[in-house]
């Protein structure tokens, strides 16, 4: 099939390469803009703290399940096949712009449970370092600047994600 397509349109192969190249350039450009670079550092820090142990991951899943149950009980969520799955926070990769977008979307989807887990680590962490890191992450995730950047980056990256998907 690939040979047939390449015979008819010899440049078709390069569209996929262009999509990957675009993602690499977007990641590189994001490191050049200090507020965006800082946002992704903070995002990764929060995800690292919350995903630091199996206990934290279990606590995150339990908090997410409780939130889904609560929202279903008050008719805030619709039910259906594949809806309301319990997931995990996605860590952004170093080379794929799409992974940065998935990381943002996963945090937005699990914002409440993530804040709850950070609160619990802050209060019941096993070391002072863990408690201190959770305290910093909790302040960060609840700051206006971070929340604004989170939603702004979701909107911007949603547009570029559609473009990258279309090129692949």
Task: Mark where each language-model region is.
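Alpha-helical structural modules in large enzymes and assemblies
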Residues: 1-168
């Amino acid at each position: 099939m690939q040979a047939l397509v390449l015979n008819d349109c010899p440049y078709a192969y390069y569209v996929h390469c262009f999509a990957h190249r675009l993602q690499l350039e977007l990641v590189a450009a994001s490191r050049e803009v200090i507020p965006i670079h800082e946002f992704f550092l903070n995002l990764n820090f929060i995800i690292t703290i919350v995903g630091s142990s199996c206990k934290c991951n279990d606590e995150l899943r339990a908090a997410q399940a409780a939130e889904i149950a609560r929202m279903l009980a008050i008719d805030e969520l619709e039910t259906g096949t594949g809806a309301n799955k319990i997931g995990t926070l996605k860590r952004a990769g170093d080379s794929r712009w799409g992974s940065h977008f998935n990381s943002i979307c996963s945090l937005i989807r699990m914002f409440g449970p993530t804040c709850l887990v950070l609160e619990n680590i802050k209060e019941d962490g096993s070391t002072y370092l863990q408690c201190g890191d959770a305290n910093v992450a909790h302040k960060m995730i609840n700051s206006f600047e971070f929340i604004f950047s989170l939603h702004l980056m979701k909107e911007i990256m949603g547009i570029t994600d559609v473009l990258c998907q279309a090129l692949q």
